[in-house]
A protein has these predicted regions:
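Helix N-terminus capping/helix-initiation residues
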Residues: 28, 135, 262-263
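Short, flexible helical or helix-coil boundary motifs
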Residues: 20-24, 39, 43-46, 50, ...
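Intrinsically disordered, low-complexity regulatory regions
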Residues: 180-288
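Glycine-centered secondary-structure boundary/capping sites
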Residues: 21, 94, 262-263
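Conserved small-residue
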Residues: 1-73
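Basic, glycine-/proline-tolerant helical and adjacent loop/strand elements
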Residues: 51-189
């Protein structure tokens, strides 16, 4: 299956490829249909872990994950979405498998299952608007993406043009998920460090050619928030070089790592270097 470069669909695709031990290009629509039993169980286990319990409302508020009582289970809900495929153009993957006019309103695709899709034709939580063309396969993969999510102040995901990065990122997250679920991990007092998770991934490379975007989002309540940080390629390669020269800890002591996400590293780096040089000169004068 080709990537859509939608952050949720792509992360779900890599998660599925991880559990099926396949390359993403070898994933078929039949694989997605056949995976629903397995992946529904994985998601239920994941959100039942206290450490990650907030993610279900931050990602899929008003869904079968957050309101299971009296409604279909997540498994049944996803199976129902698959049955409501059509032959209209999907605005995410470009395939002709979407269906807008669905008789059973329970299976209209809205924000409860598809974060960050905003349009005049897209269903909101109250389902009083016309639907946007999104196929059920993209919806199912979007639900799977929760397994790659982490929480800082917001839920967040990475997306990259680098296939290697996405595979490494997914593998790292899923291994951590497995351990946390088995141990019944509790909520952490300190929020997950977004920059540190990036460092641990990219520093295994000798160089990095792709681009990385970080999506921070909250899809709870009647409004949704999303912020996209584009992480410059040169910043990623700088982290790699600092790691090679054992300077990464010094870099972080100057609190320069936080400027990677907002794209202002150069100016703040020069300011810190100037400050250090100035302090060194003052020390030299005092010693004279």
């Amino acid at each position: 299956m080709d990537r859509s470069y939608n952050v949720f669909v792509d992360n779900g695709l890599y998660v599925l490829a991880y559990y099926l031990n396949k390359d993403i290009n070898d994933i078929t629509y039949q694989d997605i249909e056949n995976s629903i039993d397995l992946m529904s169980d994985k998601i239920e286990e994941f959100v039942s872990c206290e450490k990650y319990s907030n993610l279900k409302s931050m990602c899929f508020s008003n869904s079968a994950l957050t309101q299971p009582k009296g409604k279909a289970t997540l498994n049944e809900k996803l199976q129902g979405f698959i049955k409501n495929q059509g032959n209209e153009y999907c605005s995410l993957c470009g395939q002709y498998k979407a269906k807008v006019k669905i008789e059973d309103k329970e299976y209209n695709i809205g924000r409860s299952y598809m974060p960050n899709l905003v349009a005049n034709t897209f269903y909101n939580f109250s389902n009083n608007l016309q639907g946007l063309n999104v196929c059920p396969y993209c919806l199912v993969l979007t639900m799977y993406s929760i397994l790659n999510c982490r929480v800082s102040r917001y839920a967040f995901l990475y997306n990259s043009t680098s296939n290697e990065f996405m595979e490494d990122y997914t593998c790292s997250i899923q291994e951590e998920n497995l351990t946390d679920v088995e141990l019944g991990a509790k909520k952490e007092k300190e929020k997950h460090s977004i920059v540190e998770s990036l460092e641990s991934l990219v520093c295994k490379y000798n160089s990095f050619d792709g681009n990385i975007e970080q999506y921070m989002f909250n899809n709870s309540g009647q409004s949704q928030d999303i912020n996209v940080n584009s992480i410059k390629n040169k910043y990623v390669n700088l982290l790699i070089k600092l790691q090679e020269k054992a300077l990464l800890s010094h870099f972080k002591k100057l609190h320069l790592d936080r400027y990677i996400l907002n794209g202002t590293l150069e100016s703040n780096y020069l300011r810190e270097v100037y400050k250090v040089k100035k302090e060194e000169k003052m020390d030299e004068k005092e010693q004279e």
